[in-house]
Design a protein with these regions (language model features):
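Helix-turn-helix
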Residues: 13-16, 20-58, 62
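Hydrophobic alpha-helical connector segments
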Residues: 62, 73-105, 157-161, 183, ...
């Protein structure tokens, strides 16, 4: 560790600590975000991190919210790029089960476990789950209005879909079934929930 520390403003140091925490979480999950690990990542003494981030529970919660919030923004943009609700829903769900999202999947899975002992994290998780459910319900509602989907309660269906996504992504961490099989299983289930003909969503997957 350097014997001298570059002096930075409070805002700069806070941003640096936040960036380091996010980098650690993406590399090894939320459990890797510890005072000592963040300090090592930044290249400063743990006491300096503690000064600018006095609550590790808050830092972990904020790290989670930043990473999954970025993912939601990315997926919202993906949905907007599609011309129909059916195309948007199929693209979004396939993206969420893509193996390239393994780092965020681990963060989600650990958040439910760690949130049992970290109420700040638990609150962030609930907020993000609500945001994701609202987003999916919006896509479904657009499809219902356009006559593509048939359902009575888009919000309830969105919650059920998220439960399936979370479960299948958890399965992916131990390589149970391959990604294409998990995606087809999910889309076929959603087709039934939205009263669609078989393959309306599955048929939109790349061959």
């Amino acid at each position: 560790m350097p014997s001298t520390v570059t002096r930075r403003s409070a805002a700069e140091r806070t941003a640096q600590i936040s960036s380091a925490a996010q980098s650690l979480a993406r590399e090894a999950g939320l459990s890797a975000v510890t005072l000592r690990a963040v300090a090592t990542e930044v290249g400063v003494a743990p006491a300096l991190v503690a000064h600018y981030a006095p609550s590790m529970d808050t830092l972990v919660g904020d790290t989670f919210a930043a990473i999954v919030g970025d993912e939601l923004s990315e997926v919202e943009e993906l949905a907007r790029s599609r011309s129909t609700a059916s195309d948007a829903l199929a693209a979004v769900l396939a993206s969420l089960l893509d193996e390239g999202r393994a780092e965020v999947t681990l963060i989600w899975v650990q958040s439910w476990s760690l949130g049992g002992r970290n109420e700040t994290l638990a609150a962030r998780v609930r907020e993000q789950m609500d945001a994701w459910r609202t987003f999916l319900a919006g896509v479904i509602d657009v499809g219902r209005g356009a006559g593509e989907f048939r359902c009575d309660d888009p919000l309830a269906i969105a919650g059920q879909i998220l439960g399936m996504v979370d479960g299948l992504n958890a399965h992916s961490l131990v390589a149970w079934q391959d990604a294409s099989e998990r995606t087809r299983l999910l889309l076929r289930s959603v087709e039934a929930m939205l009263d669609l003909e078989p393959d309306v969503l599955v048929g939109r997957l790349p061959v």
